[in-house]
Amino acid sequence: MTSAQTMLNRVITLAMLASMLVVHSACSMTKERDPLTPPGVIVSPYDATQGDVLWAVIPPLNESGTSIADPNEVGDAIVAAVQQIRGVRCLPLNRTIDAMRSLGFLGGIETSSDAHQIAEYLGADGVLVGSITAYDPYDPPTLGLALALYAKPGAMAQTTSASLDTRALTSAFSDFGTTAGHNFAGQPVSVVSEHLDGRNHEVQYAARAYAEGRSERQSAMQWRIYLASMDLYTQFAAHHTVGRLIDEEWLRLARQPASEGAYD
């Protein structure tokens, strides 16, 4: 009798354990999973009827005052940010470095003419020149970036409806859209400068927005991981600064029809 009771108790215990496992499994299946959220994207203002425009990125100059800033690493982050712009393609940084070596600019560029030569050599519609103005990898990090965009006239327009102006074809370099031939203008079409201090709450807010769709919500650090890693912070800073540059491009092209009206 005692043996039978012992066996019965074991059966009851096993049945209870099995029931608990079933309930736990059901709860796990019904538990809401971390929803996927698409990250924010940058959209270019350029006319896409002829395909994406092509940019080249020159490794930024290190003007931060510290030797630990790597221009090539920051340049790669800028290239990655440009690649994420809808309507824009970007050449790999190594392609640009090879072009600089072939043209004798391995020590860096000194004038806008140097940037133009590199862009013409690569067949790019635009070339992005920049500098690292601040670099502090310690928590909270700081990164300053300045970017200047040089563009081939006619290659980065908002619309193709503008009529051809024969006077513009013989004019000297002026502003975008009214210069001669396919040469690059002497001045950048858009310039931005950002100093992103990780202690600044506005910068933290921008980093959190950038992390949306790019980080795990259930992780311990969540969006703050972009403040804890200088590599990730550099990705954020490059994306933020490139986004500001595109904002300037939207404004520039919004003003373009008014400036071209005299030639219609």
Language-model segment annotations:
Residues 60-63, 95-96, 132-135, 146-155:
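Solvent-exposed coil/turn segments that connect beta secondary-structure elements
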Residues 54-57, 65-129, 169-177, 238-251:
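N-terminal segment of the mature soluble domain
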Residues 13-24:
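Bacterial N-terminal signal peptides
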Residues 128, 143-145:
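Hydrophobic residues positioned within well-ordered beta-strands of beta-sheet architectures
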Residues 21, 49, 121-124:
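Alpha-helix termination/capping residues and helix-transition junctions
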Residues 120, 136-138:
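Short, solvent-exposed beta-strand/turn "edge" segments of beta-rich domains on protein surfaces
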Residues 2-15:
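Bacterial N-terminal signal peptides that target proteins for export
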Residues 27-51, 138, 142, 153-264:
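C-terminal/domain-edge helix-coil "capping" segments
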